[in-house]
């Protein structure tokens, strides 16, 4: 993050210079045009009177040409100075970021099945972004066969999201009503918040929409139990329709941020109904990589300097723990207390009859014949009675 801050500071300097140069350039050119325009009018007047330029006017014309030349040279010089500032941004990027990241890669990681999985993840990401043409082109180039049923939900969701971004609620309301039972099963407040926004949009129309707003308030009835206070606030705002909601204690109802919030809520709840994560796997992987890559490059350099290349064999493990933040916590992680190793798909956690948990590798190493003694209590049991645990 320090490297990003350094580059950002250089970039801010350049942008500041761009803004200042643009204003100075525009101001200088306007002054020149005004000065040259005035001189032109004087020349035309002199031509109408005697047809010849006076000595004074000729001198002024010479000075005007010199002023134009000096101004252009000054602007060109300032422009060169900006170029040097731009080059400093490039140097800051080269200095603070490692252009070669191949040292932390795994040979052959994108071959065969892995390449196909990556292509499928990219296709799903493009579907989520509404870039259907790009996704279909990638399917053809990668030789993927994507069923139309996989694409249709994303088409509908993107259509609704685009409507919400321009503050059109009808498509989202229709979707929420048709999926009401499933939304209520997951305790979603999406439909209520959509009705709330529509009601607020009616309030913004003033007294003209008062009757329609009262009629529309009937849609709040199914949500009265869980959103009673919010509904009371909405109904109380009707008292101030005549003077305008923006001039009332209910002005917070007009907060523009709630439109961005409703887009996030819709995306989250719609993805939950489809059994999808809110963010695409590609976005999550990219974000995690941006956090982990600097740490891995640094530890790789230390390992090479100390000639300890055997410490990191790059086989589905890292030499250090990389904290990706709570945003990337998707499930619990179990470390076997016997072997002091983190469990994996090939070495999952196993629950013994007594309730204690160890890894499968530890289980295989500890049983003697047909019996296994728990390392934490005196209970003896059969290894076959152990059950795999899923976090």
From Swiss-Prot:
Start and end residues of each LisH domain: 114-146
Catalytic activity: S-ubiquitinyl-[E2 ubiquitin-conjugating enzyme]-L-cysteine + [acceptor protein]-L-lysine = [E2 ubiquitin-conjugating enzyme]-L-cysteine + N(6)-ubiquitinyl-[acceptor protein]-L-lysine
GO CC terms in record: cytoplasm; nucleoplasm; nucleus; ubiquitin ligase complex
Any Gene Ontology biological process: proteasome-mediated ubiquitin-dependent protein catabolic process
Pfam family for this entry, one: CTLH
Keywords annotated in UniProt: Cytoplasm, Metal-binding, Nucleus, Transferase, Ubl conjugation pathway, Zinc, Zinc-finger
Subcellular localization, as worded in the UniProt entry: Nucleus, Nucleoplasm; Cytoplasm
EC top class named in words: transferase
Zinc finger (RING-Gid-type): 336-377
GO molecular function terms noted in the UniProt entry: ubiquitin protein ligase activity; ubiquitin-protein transferase activity; zinc ion binding
InterPro entries (UniProt xref): CRA_dom (IPR013144), CTLH/CRA (IPR024964), CTLH_C (IPR006595), Fyv10_fam (IPR045098), LisH (IPR006594), RMD5A_dRING (IPR037680), ZF_RING_GID (IPR044063), Znf-RING_euk (IPR027370)
Superkingdom per UniProt: Eukaryota
SMART domains linked: CRA, CTLH, LisH
Residue ranges annotated for the CTLH domain, each copy included: 153-210
Purpose of the protein: E3 ubiquitin-protein ligase component of the CTLH complex.
Assembly information from the UniProt record: Identified in the CTLH complex that contains at least RANBP9, MKLN1, MAEA, RMND5A, GID8 and ARMC8.
Protein name: E3 ubiquitin-protein ligase RMND5A
Organism annotation: Xenopus tropicalis
Taxonomic lineage of the native organism: Eukaryota, Metazoa, Chordata, Craniata, Vertebrata
Gene that encodes the chain: rmnd5a
């Amino acid at each position: 993050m320090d490297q990003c801050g350094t580059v950002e500071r250089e970039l801010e300097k350049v942008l500041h210079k761009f803004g200042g140069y643009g204003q100075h350039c525009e101001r200088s050119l306007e002054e020149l045009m005004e000065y040259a325009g005035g001189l032109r009018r004087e020349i035309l007047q002199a031509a109408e009177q005697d047809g010849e330029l006076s000595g004074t006017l000729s001198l002024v014309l010479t000075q005007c040409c010199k002023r134009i030349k000096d101004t252009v040279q000054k602007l060109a010089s300032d422009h060169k100075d900006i170029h040097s500032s731009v080059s400093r941004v490039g140097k800051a990027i080269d200095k603070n970021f490692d252009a070669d990241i191949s040292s932390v890669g795994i040979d052959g990681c994108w071959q065969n099945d892995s390449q196909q999985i990556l292509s499928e993840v990219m296709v799903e990401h493009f579907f989520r972004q509404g870039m259907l043409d790009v996704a279909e082109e990638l399917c053809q180039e990668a030789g993927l066969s994507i069923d139309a049923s996989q694409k249709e939900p994303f088409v509908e969701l993107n259509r609704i999201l685009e409507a919400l971004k321009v503050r059109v609620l009808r498509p989202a309301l229709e979707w929420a009503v048709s999926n009401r039972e499933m939304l209520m099963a997951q305790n979603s407040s999406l439909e209520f918040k959509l009705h709330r926004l529509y009601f607020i949009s009616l309030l913004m129309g003033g007294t003209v929409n008062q009757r329609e707003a009262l009629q529309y308030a009937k849609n709040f009835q199914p949500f009265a139990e869980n959103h009673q206070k919010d509904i009371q606030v909405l109904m109380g705002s009707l008292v101030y329709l005549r003077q305008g909601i923006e001039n009332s204690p209910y002005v917070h109802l007009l907060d523009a941020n709630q439109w961005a919030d409703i887009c996030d809520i819709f995306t989250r709840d719609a993805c939950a109904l489809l059994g999808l994560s809110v963010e695409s796997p590609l976005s999550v992987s990219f974000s995690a990589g941006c956090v982990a890559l600097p740490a891995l490059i640094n530890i790789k350099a230390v390992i090479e300097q100390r000639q300890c290349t055997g410490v990191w064999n790059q086989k589905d493990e890292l030499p250090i723990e990389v904290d990706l933040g709570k945003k990337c916590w998707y499930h619990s992680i179990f470390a076997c207390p016997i072997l002091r190793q983190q469990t994996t798909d090939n070495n999952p956690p196993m629950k013994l009859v007594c309730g204690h948990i160890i890894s499968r590798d530890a289980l295989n190493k500890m049983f003697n014949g047909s019996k296994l003694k728990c390392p934490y209590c005196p209970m003896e049991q059969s290894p076959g009675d152990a059950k795999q645990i899923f976090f």
